[in-house]
Amino acid sequence: MVKRLLLTLLTLILLDGLVPGGTMVDEPQTDLNKVGFRYLTTNGIRMHIAEQGSGPLIILCHGFPESWYSWRHQIPVLAEAGYHVVAPDMRGYGKTDRPEAIDEYGMLKLVGDVVGLVRALGEEKAIIVGHDWGAAVAAQAAVMRPDLFTSAILLSVPYGSRRNGGSPPMESAAKMPGPKVFYQVYFQKPGVAEAEMEKDVRRSVLAMLYYASGDAPAATRFTGFFDQQAGILGSLPMPEKLPGWLTDSDLDFYAGQFRESGFRGPLNWYRNIDQNWRMGGFLLDAKLRQRSLFIAGEKDLVITGFGRGGFDRLEESLPNLSKKVLIPGRGHWIQQEAPVEVNRLLLDFLSGK
């Protein structure tokens, strides 16, 4: 019963690999020297973007807890392939505006941000790519504006068509029995998760990135549930060393971003889950009909746990899905953990393969 509820929750909420020992078997060629930065106004906020290249527009939407930098291995490769690649700091993150009110982070606002971004860039069409929460935004943007987004690539979080019936996801999740709490329920009360995470930002980011990755031992890999008394970070002991895909410089960059922005804006995305559900009735049975691609890690907590049902039903919700790929040995941060493989899949899809 609990497992079935969890599989349903993800749909409602989001309207080679690593060898043993953590050794990388692929080495990304990442050169950010040609990446430019600027601010654009979209949907009433000032958005900070990283961009490179010229040609058809590709928008890369990151998730939690990330920034434009999570696409550092993809931006140069896609630009070299002949695309204008734009990776924004999403609303509430990094150098992008972070409105105070919780309702400023609802899905319609987030979709409006990327729609407005296309127009602010002077374009009429775009390919949209998203990871984690960014995959939810990308999917909803493609569903709501098929005239604007010509194709969609989703990483880690599957899109599921809205189904009839049910109840607000967080209300349902809060009633689940057992001693542990679902992390998205823990994020609901303003100020609680922020206070825990902002005590030691670098440690917080490292814990979340490591324990949802393919490097974390199976016994300690984050499942989405934890002892509320210990807190989410208290349940995740510090790893002895960084995984091969995350350097000290990478971690320092992320920590700097969240010291600047704080966690309130990003956590406010979660605080709109039930409101997104209440406002999403018009999306009943809505399918993402553009050509699409799905990529995730074989060890991703979404795929192995509460999102498995959405993954298994992808072909129903994405009738023009060209391929769905699980990369062996990898976890939730797929474009960072397996950049060479992800880049190959992106380029193959973009070339029509």
For the regions a language model picked out, list residue spans one by one.
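Conserved HGGG/HGGXW glycine-rich cap/lid loop of the alpha/beta-hydrolase fold
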Residues: 51-97
